[in-house]
A protein has these predicted regions:
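Eukaryotic intrinsically disordered, low-complexity regulatory linkers and tails enriched in Ser/Thr/Pro
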Residues: 1-16, 20-99
Length: 99
């Protein structure tokens, strides 16, 4: 997977990382999605966290959904930004936008 043109933002948009730097993704018991970055320092970034009660639970496979979206976008000619969003009708999902 060569995701050179795919970027992932945390839910408030204050951090954006290049998707190809993601070594792994995890979902903790609170529903936070954290990605581990490649490189020797083992850095980790929480990209979906701190939800409120009215937003409900994130799907049990939300971290896998992120990897699937990145994989699907990895061959695209355009650059994309991926971020977690919540709406009342659809619940939690990964939204993409062209950069």
């Amino acid at each position: 997977m060569d995701a050179k043109n795919v970027w992932v933002a945390n839910d408030d948009g204050s951090e954006i990382i290049r998707a190809r730097e993601i070594a792994g993704a995890s979902l903790d018991y609170d529903g936070n999605v954290t990605v581990r970055l490649t490189g020797g320092d083992g850095s980790a970034v929480t990209i979906a966290g701190h939800r409120t009660h009215h937003e409900g639970s994130r799907p049990d496979d939300f971290h896998r959904q992120l990897i699937r979206v990145i994989s699907e976008l990895s061959d695209a000619a355009e650059a994309f930004l991926v971020r977690a969003v919540h709406d009342e009708a659809r619940g939690w999902r990964w939204a993409t936008e062209v950069l």
